[in-house]
Structure formats: structure tokens, C-alpha cells
């Protein structure tokens, strides 16, 4: 891990814990936390092998519709069912997800302090009555699961803002690390769709704000304000993950060309500008704002402007990680065939 990545991880940990001991300006906290989380997730997304699955254009076009259906369903559940019952079910669901996400987030750091057999040797566990079902894991994954279980139990018991944020940040980092848009065309379709999705549900209906306030699960980050009337500022995880996977794609584009992360820098600066604009407008109007309204144009605008300036629009639009994956697979098959022929 490079020094800047290590510093970013430490900065994110310190910023998350800081409100426990000192009063941190919530606006500054939102901006720094969002930006550092995207930075960490982006560099974790750079792998030696291309992603096994990428989002298609059809999936990107359907995403806002599926998101709208889920949002409206949650709104109706909270409206017609007991809020405590709905949150109890959601807490159980996120308990399992939280253990998996936090364990995966901590695993790279934990592996460095464990012996190699703990990291490499797989343990296969079969379900007692379903022999066909099996789970593979290593001892290091079990060790990483211990703090994951602790924080999930703490959140389920106390619903403390720190436990909420630790789980939320884990979801964000894993989302940016694991999700691949495949191409910038798909990314533009997704961001454009969610741009209008965010505007509609925040400005034209009470649904988004109502669900965010009622949904007692780590789908948003909470930043203590010290104000009894409004104890927390909130930032939805989607406002980090959705632009984050686009910024991560820009970083992997730079890496694929074996160049300095110039387009990543442009997209990342665009994200930071978008978050700052969101905070400024929110404080100016004293009302909830659809963050993607400001983040999406900033990210795409900064990246596109830089590409146009350098004359790199064509290679940017031609970049496709799914094709990279196919090429890598073909190369590995060819290599295997050559080795077999050599052995014969």
C-alpha cells in the first residue's frame, strides 16, 4: 500500500472517531468523510485482474426505476405497518450484511499480521442437512469477522451513531471496490438516470426525506451537530457509492494506460466540488438537497473537460472493462495451450 493510501485510511479512521472527543464542524465532516471514503474505495478497486462482472447499459437504465420502486415500497411499509416492526426486520438483514462488509473491509489490514497459512489455506464447511451447500473461508476471514460481529451487535443494541457510521463506511468502501460500471458510457447513463431520480424524489415528493428519517439502518452517515433540535447531519450512502464507482472507473482507466492518475484526479476534484456545492446550497436554503444534482454534473463536467483538453475523448469512450476481461481470459487460454503443446 502506498503512503498516500495508508494516510487516507488513517485519516478516515481518525475523522470517524474525532467527534467522540472534540466537536467537529458537521459541514466540514461531511465533505472530508465523503471525499476520503471515495479516495480509499477507488484505490482498493484497482486489482491485478479485471472485474468478473460489470454493469450493462440495460442495467444502468433500469437502476433508477428499480430504486424508485424500492423507495416507494419502503415509504408505504413505514406508512401502513409498525415502524418498529419494519426496522426490526431491516436491522436483522443489515446485521448479516454488516458483518460481511466490515470483515471484507478490515481483511487486507488484518492479513498483514497473520501467518501465511491462515491467509491461504481454505476451510470448507458443509451445512449439516444440505450437503450440497458449502462455504469456503480462511482463518484470517474468521478473525476479521470478530470486529464485524461486535460492531453489528453494538449497532443492533444501541443504534449508536459511531456504529452506524462504521458499518456505513464499510458498505461504501466495499461498494466502490467491488462494483464495476464497465465503461464510461454505462456510467454516464447511470449517473444521468440517478440525477433525475434524486431531483424528483427530493424536490417533488416527501418520500425520500421521510424514508431517510424513518429508516433506522446504516444506509446513511450521521454527523453530530451539537444541536438538540437537529442532533445529526445526514449523508446518504448512495451519494458516496454512485459517484464513487464512476471516479474509480477513471482511476482504472488511468492504470490501464500505465499513466499517472490524471483523469482520476479530475473526476475526484469534481466530486469534491459537488459535495461542497451541496453543503453550501443546503445551508443557504436550510432545506434538504438532492446531492446528485450537484455531484453528477461536477464529476462528469470536470472529467469531460480534461479529456477534451487532452484530446482523449475517443479512448475514454472506447474503454470497456468487460472487453478487458475477455482479452485477459483469451490470453490465459492461449498461454495454457502453448504450455500444453510445449509439454507434449
From Swiss-Prot:
Q: Which top EC class is named for this enzyme in its record?
A: hydrolase
Q: Where are the transmembrane segments?
A: 12-32, 63-83, 90-110, 137-157, 161-181, 189-209, 231-251, 264-284, 291-311
Record key words, sorted: Endoplasmic reticulum, Hydrolase, Membrane, Protease, Transmembrane, Transmembrane helix
Compartments in which it is found: Endoplasmic reticulum membrane
Which GO cellular component does the record give, naming just one? Answer: endoplasmic reticulum membrane
Its BP terms in the Gene Ontology are: pollen development; pollen germination; proteolysis
The protein's matches in InterPro entries, at most eight in alphabetical order, are given as:
Peptidase_A22B_SPP, Preselin/SPP
Lumenal topological domain: 1-11, 84-89, 158-160, 210-230, 285-290
According to the UniProt entry, its GO molecular function terms are:
aspartic endopeptidase activity, intramembrane cleaving
Ranges where the record places region Disordered: 323-344
Hey, what tissues is this thing expressed in? Ubiquitous with the highest expression in emerging leaves, roots, and floral tissues (at the protein level). Highly detected in pollen.
Task: Report which superkingdom the organism of origin falls in.
Answer: Eukaryota
Knockout consequences: Mostly lethal due to a male gametophytic defect.
Q: Where is this motif: PAL?
A: 290-292
What topology in the membrane does the UniProt record assign? Multi-pass membrane protein
Q: Which residues lie on this side of the membrane: Cytoplasmic?
A: 33-62, 111-136, 182-188, 252-263, 312-344
Location of the active site:
198, 239
E.C. no: 3.4.23.-
Purpose: Intramembrane-cleaving aspartic protease (I-CLiP) that cleaves type II membrane signal peptides in the hydrophobic plane of the membrane. Catalyzes intramembrane proteolysis of some signal peptides after they have been cleaved from a preprotein, resulting in the release of the fragment from the ER membrane into the cytoplasm. Plays a critical role in the development and function of the reproductive tissues, especially in pollen development.
User: Which family does this protein fall into?
Assistant: Belongs to the peptidase A22B family.
Its recorded name reads Signal peptide peptidase
State the gene name recorded for this protein. SPP
